[in-house]
Swiss-Prot record:
The chain crosses the membrane at residues 619-639. Disruption phenotype: Homozygous knockout mice are embryonically lethal and heterozygous mice also show reduced viability due to failure of implantation and arrest of embryonic stem cell population expansion. Loss of Dsp localization to cell borders in 3.5 dpc blastocysts and a decrease in Pkp2 expression in embryonic stem cells. Conditional knockout in kidney tubular epithelial cells results in an increase in injury markers, apoptosis and inflammatory infiltrates in response to induced-injury, ultimately leading to an increase in atrophic distal kidney tubules. The keyword Cytoplasm applies. Residues 640-1122 are cytoplasmic. Induction: Induced by ischemic injury or kidney disease in kidney tubular epithelial cells. Expressed in undifferentiated pluripotent stem cells, expression decreases during differentiation (at protein level). Expressed by embryonic stem cells, expression is reduced during differentiation (at protein level). Expressed at the apical-lateral cell membrane of kidney tubular epithelial cells (at protein level). Expressed in epidermis and heart (at protein level). Expressed in the brain, spleen, lung, liver skeletal muscle, kidney and testis. SUPFAM superfamilies: Cadherin-like. It is found in: Cell membrane; Cell junction, Desmosome; Cytoplasm. This is Desmoglein-2. Residues 913-932, 1089-1122 are annotated as: Disordered. Glycans are attached at residues 117, 314, 467, 519. Interacts with PKP2. Interacts with CTNNB1; the interaction promotes localization of CTNNB1 at cell junctions thus reducing its nuclear localization and subsequent transcription of CTNNB1/TCF-target genes. GO terms for cellular component: apical plasma membrane; cell surface; cytoplasm; desmosome; intercalated disc; intracellular membrane-bounded organelle; lateral plasma membrane.
Amino acid sequence: MARSPGDRCALLLLVQLLAVVCLDFGNGLHLEVFSPRNEGKPFPKHTHLVRQKRAWITAPVALREGEDLSRKNPIAKIHSDLAEEKGIKITYKYTGKGITEPPFGIFVFDRNTGELNITSILDREETPYFLLTGYALDSRGNNLEKPLELRIKVLDINDNEPVFTQEVFVGSIEELSAAHTLVMKITATDADDPETLNAKVSYRIVSQEPANSHMFYLNKDTGEIYTTSFTLDREEHSSYSLTVEARDGNGQITDKPVQQAQVQIRILDVNDNIPVVENKMYEGTVEENQVNVEVMRIKVTDADEVGSDNWLANFTFASGNEGGYFHIETDTQTNEGIVTLVKEVDYEEMKKLDLSIIVTNKAAFHKSILSKYKATPIPITVKVKNVVEGIHFKSSVVSFRASEAMDRSSLSRSIGNFQVFDEDTGQAAKVTYVKVQDTDNWVSVDSVTSEIKLVKIPDFESRYVQNGTYTAKVVAISKEHPQKTITGTIVITVEDVNDNCPVLVDSVRSVCEDEPYVNVTAEDLDGAQNSAPFSFSIIDQPPGTAQKWKITHQESTSVLLQQSERKRGRSEIPFLISDSQGFSCPERQVLQLTVCECLKGGGCVAAQYDNYVGLGPAAIALMILALLLLLLVPLLLLICHCGGGAKGFTPIPGTIEMLHPWNNEGAPPEDKVVPSLLVADHAESSAVRGGVGGAMLKEGMMKGSSSASVTKGQHELSEVDGRWEEHRSLLTAGATHHVRTAGTIAANEAVRTRATGSSRDMSGARGAVAVNEEFLRSYFTEKAASYNGEDDLHMAKDCLLVYSQEDTASLRGSVGCCSFIEGELDDLFLDDLGLKFKTLAEVCLGRKIDLDVDIEQRQKPVREASVSAASGSHYEQAVTSSESAYSSNTGFPAPKPLHEVHTEKVTQEIVTESSVSSRQSQKVVPPPDPVASGNIIVTETSYAKGSAVPPSTVLLAPRQPQSLIVTERVYAPTSTLVDQHYANEEKVLVTERVIQPNGGIPKPLEVTQHLKDAQYVMVRERESILAPSSGVQPTLAMPSVAAGGQNVTVTERILTPASTLQSSYQIPSETSITARNTVLSSVGSIGPLPNLDLEESDRPNSTITTSSTRVTKHSTMQHSYS
């Protein structure tokens, strides 16, 4: 049914009216806000409800901060219509800030009435807005109505003062800045509502330091600081300090406290000052030929900030340094200009250099002084100091050209020289030229003239030629002192000749049949002008080769080769290859090409299966022959004779045990048999005593060894088998002599000879077990000292005794109890040194050796009794030491008599002595009848002779039993026998032992002819005969030792000179070895020793071949004659 427009308007009005009625009288939760002005009367109900997004919300409630609002409670109330309509018990509840959220305790509400009360003073700066939610709940806590929101706004009051964000503000501005230039901005904040005037801040400058004039002003609203003028000068004031304050509102002065802050403004430096040089001109001095030396320093002052670019000076050369001799830089610490010589100057070329510099700053000048600055050069004069110069090359590199086509006749020609000149005179210097680098030895340089010649034809293709040049270096060494050197370089440019033809790089190739092309490459060792590009052509030999293969593409040094028909097999393709000059090799270049089937990703299949290796006929035949030889070896062993002695030399088992392996360079082999020589406990058991025949060696085991000792001054160095030993010698420089000794050394045996306390180890297989010399010396010294201490407890039996009628008592104990002389050392081990030594002796002699001969061989050391001094607390003794040893192949003349001796003060000295000349502060008495027993030790020695040798030479040959006569005489002159050279000295005791083989009678001792008849002389003589076990003749005439040989007389003498002998007496050296411990306490010299003319046997061509020693001790009491 259609309606008219009037009807539609009436219906719309009716709907609106119904809605208003529902709003006013329908069910719902209502909020009443009480107006503070109406004292508890609520606001009109409909003016505080606003429709928004289909929900009813209340308008905010405004409460002022800082006031007591408790008198205005309740400030709001919520109510539900269901309480009246249905009579339901309703409970009201609020949540939100101030109640259930911090800050707590601001609001409280009544659960029954829904009234909201305020309990605290509000602070907008703490909580500017409160949002509360109200609920209407039934008894079960369920919402009866939709929750209602309540907004409470806190109104601001001006209760806060402005506060600066910093206590100190820092800013900066360049000096000479224009007026009204912004310097910085300061900031202060106010906690009041920024949308009100309560938060407005006003700024003001309170004071300025320094306060000479106001340089800055402050915008009171924005806090910006500006300059007042352009007169800021850092050199005057480098910084300013401002005190500023901030106030509320427009800056009215009130009673409220005012916040202040400090502002520090630093004035930045600009380059508004020109650097000033200290002096107007400078002078310096440098030595020629020096480099990197400081010439001078130029000091500059600048008023700008120290250390900045505006202060640092910048130096530039205006003139005079076109040669680049000098360099100038700035010292950043002192702002000085350092002028340095960086290139050598020559006094002969320039004696003075004039320079000029300009000084600026590192930073550009400020615009305020650009018009004032004018560059002014600073003159500098540098004088060159002349020095004595060395040598130099005019050019350190000299170049020559040489062709590899030159002939050999041109090698002797000079290609140039490399002359060195004296830098002072400019003339050629006197130097020596030496090559230091000539890798392939191409050139020779004359050491005097520096002339350069080629010694080899240059080869361009040599691996030492780089880029067509060969380099050598020459050093010139000056002849003056100190020597100076200079190095020059010789560069030889080699001219290439087309003497090499292009050849194939790889003449044997294998390609797969599916490859369309074959790359063929050639090379030529000549230079670029005589090598590539190459020309390739295929030679049609055999005919048809050129049609089968063709060249499809050619590069400079290679071509691509293509086969007309794909066919497997091997082909030889001859090429004619020529270089850029048309030169080719006379022989054809043949490419051996194999076309084969290839696996995918692999090589030729045929090549992979051709690796089979099998045994050929020759290998099989060799294996069969080897088996036959193995079968033949047992048959050959049956033919060999077992157990038969070999003819000729007897094999020596275990040669490493007996013979020294001279072909080994290492240490001697380990000794496996410890010699019994070191087993004895006493001092005498560690050495073999002996003179000429002191070393008892087995027949056939002698090996001659020569040793020479040189005695000069007061030391003696002896070389024995390449080893030097030092011995003390009391000879003066005038009495220096050479004593040559020849000893006997057993091969591969260590024979230790104890000679006057010194120990010698002869090289041999037993050298590894030799005891240390220092250990032996210390051991025997302590041993002798212990026996010396024991002597005080025993009565002396074997020395000159001191009686009551003599002047002084003995200061030293007697050595009468010399039990250690008879030690456990037994030399019988030398009789049989074992089967190995016997076999070696048989090999060397070529005959059998019988060891059944019973030979007595003993040796006990002979010790000399020490005599106490007559007075004083020291024991004086003058000793002359010499030694004579003998070799089987070397003869030396006997030592000459000594005419002068010298004594020196030593302590605990161990010497080797042969002749002993002693001076003792004690009266010596002549001995009694020789028949009576006395303190006498007689050494009886027998010798057998061998081949003829010169006099004073003894050969220690194989031992033969024989008879000897030993004669011992003792002469003791009385105290009246005074010699003119020894008028102030004491007595002399002369002892002589004469040892003779059969056939020689000792001659009488001719000493009495030199003594005056009026003096008393006591002579004691004793003869003993030593004979082998077979017996000897009762007479002294015994048969000769060896047929056809001559007899040998060996005389051993011990002489003790004193003042009673005449100066004409000569004492020869005695050949003996004695162990003594000598202590000297005074230094003096005596005259020539007396010559007693004791006759020695001088029969030539005699040799001692066997020695036997027996030591017998006799006791004799000696008396004094008045």
